[in-house]
Amino acid sequence: MFHGPTSSFLAPKIAFALVSFSLGELGDGLNIFQGIYLVGIGWNEGSIGIALSLMGLTALLVQTVAGDIVDKTTFDRRNFLIAASIVTALSASAILFVTEGNNEHALIFISKIIEGVASSFIGPCLAALTLASFGPDHFDAVMASNILWGHVGSVASAVLAGASAYILYPNIKYCFLVIGFSALIAVIFVRFLPEGDPLMGRGFKGKVALDESGQEEIIEGAPTEDLQHEQEAASYMSVFSDRNTFVLCLTGFFFHFANANVLLVLGELMGGDNDDGSPSRSAIPLIAGAIVTAQATMSIATIAGDRLTEKGFGRKPLFLFGLITLPLRCALIIYWKDAGDAFLLSTQVFDGLGGGFFGLIHPYLVADITFGTGRFNLVMGLTASCFGLGATLSNYIGQTVVEKLGHVASLSGSLVLSFIPVILFACFMPETMGKRGNIANKATEEKGKSYTNMEMA
């Protein structure tokens, strides 16, 4: 059954945009600034590395399960989103209670594990609510808006955190108050989101959805009432063994394996360190500038990708464009490593283009592949886990190479690896645009035949 907006105060698409903006500010807990703060109060690099890796490792293990829970839950997904936002903010804010000295590791380690679990539910919940409310026909446009405003929120978060960290340096812990404020905003606006059709939110075909203006419309080719409730989810084996899902997971793994370490190396090449190993005050605006440049470019890339999709450009060329920006970025950083901070900072434009197109097309591809199977959020979680595994290995191996062989060797490794996802996706992923309805119709028709045969028997 479809549940429309609970209030006419905000149009549903605007409510989703405001929630996405707030969650973008919540981001990843401003990990890079947390690392700066912990170095400043006496933590060693090894302890910081463990602390900042725990969230990613936990999310890596939990995201697929979180997606499956979001698919199968009978509870209101809006409550899941509220709980996940609050817990993420509280756990990320635990750093405010760490005292000076290389101690109190348990508090941060435990909070990062909790943060990893809670944050794993945010993406699937928001995607599920979007699909449940707007259906397959308007999902792309509204999801593009969500992603755009998420990037804008990340820009706002980086600007606020960077400015307060620079002003309060070296006592920068109060910049983390932006995390709690962002969670509060998210909780307020989540209540204005429609619940939509819970079955449609997991990738089944529904009868009613909202258009972009918030008006209800009948979905073309909708199943009968009996068939809608008789829809069964595809087996786990069929989902995990699907070739397109496998190619997407492998492509994303290698993209993030090559990409994640690059920002760390870039930060090490820009600015400078104090004698104790902590970033200098002059490095803080550069670090914030790198984040802002990338996120602002991602916003532009998201708008461009949405417009191109509306004009009929397929998923494959847009996703490939995002992948190709990574080897260009690595090559430019190597070439400009001694050219000055301005040149190095400008390479973040390529990070923004790559991340923008990758982040936009990823949920489109998952919706295309899974619609009609009832496993949309499961595959969103599975792919996110593969991406996270690549990023975690990238940070660990990339920084080990930096320590042993230097920055150029680490970047050269990323450059070579960055061609693997391009080749994989170009050779093995078919174009999926326009196939979403076909998958859903096929699933409905097969169920209809089965239902008719049972009645005849």
Show which residues each predicted segment covers.
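Juxtamembrane intracellular "pre-TM" segments in multi-pass secondary transporters
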Residues: 1-10, 197-248, 442-456
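Helix-loop boundary and gating motifs at the non-cytosolic
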Residues: 2-56, 246-251, 256-273
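Intracellular juxtamembrane helix-capping segments at the cytosolic ends
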Residues: 34, 121-134, 357-372
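Helix-to-loop junctions at the C-terminal end of transmembrane segments
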Residues: 62-75, 165, 300-314, 402
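C-terminal ends and interior cores of transmembrane alpha-helices
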Residues: 86-102, 324-338
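Cytoplasmic helix-loop-helix junction between adjacent transmembrane helices
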Residues: 111-150
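Glycine-rich segments within core transmembrane alpha-helices of 12-TM secondary carriers
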Residues: 141-161, 384-394
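Symmetry-related core transmembrane helices of the 12-TM Major Facilitator Superfamily/SLC fold
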Residues: 173-191, 410-427
